[in-house]
Curated annotation (Swiss-Prot):
Keywords: Ribonucleoprotein, Ribosomal protein, RNA-binding, rRNA-binding. GO terms for biological process: translation. One of the primary rRNA binding proteins, it binds directly to 16S rRNA central domain where it helps coordinate assembly of the platform of the 30S subunit. SUPFAM superfamilies: Ribosomal protein S8. This is Small ribosomal subunit protein uS8. It comes from the Bacteria. It comes from Trichormus variabilis (strain ATCC 29413 / PCC 7937) (Anabaena variabilis). The gene is rpsH. PANTHER family: 40S RIBOSOMAL PROTEIN S15A. InterPro entries: Ribosomal_uS8, Ribosomal_uS8_CS, Ribosomal_uS8_sf. Belongs to the universal ribosomal protein uS8 family. Part of the 30S ribosomal subunit. Contacts proteins S5 and S12. GO terms for molecular function: rRNA binding; structural constituent of ribosome.
Length: 133
């Protein structure tokens, strides 16, 4: 099944795998999904990323992280902000803070995909892709 919004598809797959307490989940590999997964890994929300599949159909294998002996997911929520039908942009002065700094906003800037903190540090604005906390 082809997804028009690959970012929303990725977030939904991660959310569903978290609720079902799966170790890993498969996400279609695109430049955008690779970049978002890399940011999530750098921020400590997911354990590791690897790729599988042939040249035509590559998938990212995302290993999820859990905490405690009840295996509570580290990712409490994933929320898509900018959608294909309604793009949301933010300048450097108005970058959102997610839950007062506890969560992160993933921003697409002219220097690549990064967190809201990194965009603030580099004095950049851009498209607000999603919130993670």
């Amino acid at each position: 099944m082809a997804a028009n919004d690959t970012i929303a598809d990725m977030l939904t797959r991660i959310r569903n795998a978290n609720m079902a307490r799966h170790q890993t989940t498969l996400v279609p590999a695109t430049k955008m999904t690779r970049s978002i997964a890399k940011v999530l890994q750098e921020e400590g929300f997911i354990a590791e990323i690897s790729e599988e599949g042939d040249e035509v159909k590559r998938n990212l294998v995302i290993a999820l992280k859990y905490k405690g002996k009840n295996r509570q997911p580290l990712i409490t929520a994933l929320k898509r902000v900018s959608k294909p039908g309604l793009r949301v942009y933010s300048n450097r002065k108005e970058l959102p803070r997610v839950l007062g700094g506890i969560g992160i906003a993933i921003i697409s800037t002219s220097s690549g995909i990064m967190t809201d903190r990194e965009a603030r540090r580099q004095n950049l604005g851009g498209e607000v892709l999603c919130y993670v906390w």
